[in-house]
């Protein structure tokens, strides 16, 4: 059987944890940040866990993570 290909776009966006979960960046932290509070920007700069409903799709895109 041939090797499974990794979707490079997904590999750049998601990182696997030691327990098999996937981490992702939060949205709304690229531009138009002037009117957002420091607390919100600090929160948006942290990583978030991919929801369990989406984790199966991420796992298919990154088979060797």
Swiss-Prot record:
Keywords assigned by UniProt? Answer: Ribonucleoprotein, Ribosomal protein
User: Which InterPro entries does this UniProt record tie to the protein?
Assistant: Ribosomal_bL35 (IPR001706), Ribosomal_bL35-like (IPR021137), Ribosomal_bL35_CS (IPR018265), Ribosomal_bL35_sf (IPR037229)
Q: Which Gene3D superfamilies match?
A: 4.10.410.60
What biological-process GO terms show up in the record? translation
Q: Key word Ribonucleoprotein present in the record?
A: yes
Q: What is a single Pfam family found in this protein's UniProt entry?
A: Ribosomal_L35p
Molecular function (GO) terms for this protein are: structural constituent of ribosome
> What PROSITE patterns does the database record attribute to this sequence?
RIBOSOMAL_L35
Q: Name one GO cellular component term.
A: cytosolic large ribosomal subunit
**NCBIfam families attached to this UniProt entry:** rpmI_bact
Family, per the entry? Belongs to the bacterial ribosomal protein bL35 family.
In Swiss-Prot or TrEMBL terms, this protein is called: Large ribosomal subunit protein bL35
Q: What gene is behind this protein?
A: rpmI
């Amino acid at each position: 059987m041939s090797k499974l290909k990794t979707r490079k776009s997904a590999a750049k966006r998601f990182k696997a944890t030691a327990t098999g979960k996937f981490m992702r960046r939060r949205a709304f932290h690229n531009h138009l940040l002037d009117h957002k509070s420091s607390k919100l920007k600090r929160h948006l700069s942290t990583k978030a866990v991919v929801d369990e409903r989406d984790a199966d799709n991420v796992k298919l895109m990154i088979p060797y993570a």
